[in-house]
Amino acid sequence: MKARQVVAGVHVLLAAVHVYWATGATWPAIDQRSLSQAVLGQEVSFAPQVVLPLAALHVVLAVAVLKVDSLRLARLVVAGLAAGLAVRTAAGLVWDFGLGTDSGTAFYWLNLFFYTPACITLLAVDLRLLRTRQLTELAA
């Protein structure tokens, strides 16, 4: 599977999860407060008006990575993804060292073993896309 398909697939999966949460479902948590604490480390709304725009953003990013018809635009999209992931990775590493989060929370452990490693992996894939000629396929 090509790197850009992996990146797009992750964004489609994230879009689906956000749409799922917009229905009021709280899996993998037992309630919205627990979900918010586990996903974000603080209490925030998972109301449709909050999560549906995020779902739409992930769909737009997935389509842009797969279907953009300009190499320059493709590089800008992937560079934007990489920049966002770099910021999230940096924040995740800070939280991994216990700064700004309590090590007794679900968020701390999810961040340590899932969120930050996932961001590092996606960042590496995005950087690989920027370094290779795979994006030339997007112009065809």
Question: Over which residues does each language-model region extend?
Answer:
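Core segments of alpha-helical transmembrane spans in multipass integral membrane proteins
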Residues: S36-L66, A83, P117, T121
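N-terminal signal-anchor transmembrane alpha helix
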Residues: R4-A22
